[in-house]
């Protein structure tokens, strides 16, 4: 598939009864395509213009997932160990970057031209405070990365004859 030169990180949500909520498992994928647009709509009930961004992300079957295997969302939810698995479903988070462990976030070094957090010179106090803790959460990811979307829909195009891939729409 042409123009698949982006690195993304997919964060799969999984209910953890011991934690009392979702745990977010990351998968870094090299060789994806990210296309984003900004749009506005007029909504009188919300006081006028409402801005939203929309992203279309394509992940070719041959993209590098770091050795992890794709599985359907039901199998992912029922698996005892998801360390070698990844999936795509509504509500997951996708970031246009190779997201480091949260403990390394403040000191991570980003190569020239690589997608990096909102503040490339170093984290300001607000961003640094927003990403403290042991685990990434959607709020922390959205505070740290400009290109961060919530998955709204997934189309499985793996049976396409010319370019088998998954297509994600998100906002």
Across the structure, where does each feature detected by a protein language model lie?
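Acidic/glycine-rich C-terminal interaction modules and beta/coil loop segments
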Residues: 135-141, 146, 156-171
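Short, acidic/charged, Gly/Pro-enriched secondary-structure junctions
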Residues: 8, 76-148, 152
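N-terminal disorder-to-order initiation segments that are Gly/Lys/Arg-biased
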Residues: 1-77, 158, 164-171
């Amino acid at each position: 598939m042409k123009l698949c030169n982006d690195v993304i990180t997919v964060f799969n949500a999984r209910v953890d009864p011991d934690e009392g909520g979702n745990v977010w498992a990351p998968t870094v994928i090299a060789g994806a395509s990210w296309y984003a647009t900004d749009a506005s709509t007029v909504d009188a009930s919300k006081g006028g213009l409402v801005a939203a961004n929309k992203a279309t992300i394509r992940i070719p079957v041959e993209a590098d997932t770091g050795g992890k295997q794709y599985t359907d969302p039901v199998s992912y939810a029922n698996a005892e160990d998801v360390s070698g698995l990844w999936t795509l479903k509504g509500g997951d988070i996708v970031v246009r970057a190779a997201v480091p462990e949260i403990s390394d976030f403040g000191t991570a070094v980003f190569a020239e031209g690589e997608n990096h957090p909102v503040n490339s010179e170093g984290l300001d106090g607000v961003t640094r405070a927003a990403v403290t803790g042991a685990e990434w959460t959607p709020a922390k990811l959205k505070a740290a990365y400009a290109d961060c979307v919530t998955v709204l829909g997934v189309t499985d195009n793996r049976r396409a004859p010319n370019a088998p891939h998954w297509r994600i729409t998100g906002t």
